[in-house]
Curated annotation (Swiss-Prot):
Belongs to the acetyltransferase family. Acetyl-CoA binds at residues 99-101, 107-112, 138. GO terms for molecular function: acetyl-CoA binding; protein-N-terminal amino-acid acetyltransferase activity. This is N-alpha-acetyltransferase 80. CDD domains: NAT_SF. Its EC number is 2.3.1.-. It comes from the Eukaryota. InterPro entries: Acyl_CoA_acyltransferase, GNAT_dom, NAA80. It comes from Drosophila melanogaster (Fruit fly). PANTHER family: N-ACETYLTRANSFERASE 6, N-ALPHA-ACETYLTRANSFERASE 80. Residues 26-178 form the N-acetyltransferase domain. It catalyses: N-terminal L-aspartyl-L-aspartyl-L-aspartyl-[protein] + acetyl-CoA = N-terminal N-acetyl-L-aspartyl-L-aspartyl-L-aspartyl-[protein] + CoA + H(+); N-terminal L-glutamyl-L-glutamyl-L-glutamyl-[protein] + acetyl-CoA = N-terminal N-acetyl-L-glutamyl-L-glutamyl-L-glutamyl-[protein] + CoA + H(+).
């Protein structure tokens, strides 16, 4: 995995070209030229207006929210995306959402790769302790990479606010302590 470094942005993250991999993980706000392709990738999975999606991507910053993309060497093609969002009720945590891998590249380890980078980024750059997420049908994947089931949480509202258990809800909430 090769990490693009922009001092001191990635200071402390794993070294460059450790595996000689032809892939990069980068924050989208440092590479605005990737936003249109990223928008198309996300909208292929969860359709939404291009304007709304682009506004969400343009909100990415060095802290939270931050959208990360996995690209080919030379930034030619976006393969995967995820977004890290703040949780108002948990200051040392974030919520990962919009995790998507291009359909042509699923089952090749790219989801695991971008999640691992996001965990490192959260721990080293953002000094966060826990990552939360929700999923409808990918809980097996998240379990395999170390996530555990937890009570539903809200990204908004007062500190330490948890939602009551929703027995019939399809969403499953998970977390990983970093």
């Amino acid at each position: 995995m090769r990490y693009i470094k922009s001092e001191p942005y990635y200071e402390g993250l794993p070294p460059f070209n450790v595996s000689g991999s032809p892939f990069n993980v980068v924050p989208i706000h440092n590479y605005p030229e990737l936003m249109k392709d990223t928008c198309a990738l996300i909208n292929a999975e969860w359709p939404r207006s291009e304007t709304a999606r682009m506004r969400s991507l343009e909100a990415s910053c060095d802290s939270l929210p931050c959208s990360l993309v996995l690209t080919t060497e030379g930034m030619c093609r976006v393969i995967a995306h995820l977004k890290l969002s703040p949780i108002n009720s948990k200051k040392k945590a974030c919520f990962v959402e919009s995790v998507v891998v291009d359909k042509r590249h699923r089952g090749q380890g790219f989801g695991k790769l971008i999640m691992k980078f996001a965990e490192d980024y959260c721990r080293v750059v953002l000094d966060l302790k826990t990552i939360y997420l929700s999923t409808i049908d990918q809980d097996g994947f998240y379990e395999r990479i170390g996530y555990e089931y937890c009570a539903p949480i809200t990204m908004y509202g007062p500190r330490h606010c948890e939602l009551p258990s929703l027995q019939n809800a399809k969403k499953k909430y998970m977390k990983k302590v970093l």
